[in-house]
Amino acid sequence: MKKVEKAAAIRSTKYIHVIAPCPTGWGIKTEDCIEVAKEVVDCGLWYLAEFENGEFHINRKPKEFTDVATYIKRQGRFKHLDESDIQAIIAGRDAKWNFINKHFN
């Protein structure tokens, strides 16, 4: 809520990009929503960041990523993915974080 309150106090254009797990669409239990939202950040598939006064800052940078396959396999929406798909997702994650680390460290 602090980020929403901070944005509300700004007298300018604001944009908040939120990840909100959907139990029905994602094939997870309702009680797992918060854990899944944290897990997507921990495995590096979603990053927490702010862009303020012309500067981009990563708010949370995991020292080591947790297992992407564990995150993916717990969700029904990804049941069709095989190991090669998961490896492609990991490669995309690594490329994204290499870019972030190179340009926004």
Regions found by a protein language model. Name each.
Residues M1-T30:
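ATP/pyrophosphate-binding catalytic subdomain of soluble kinases
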Residues A20-N105:
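Flexible, low-complexity linker and terminal segments
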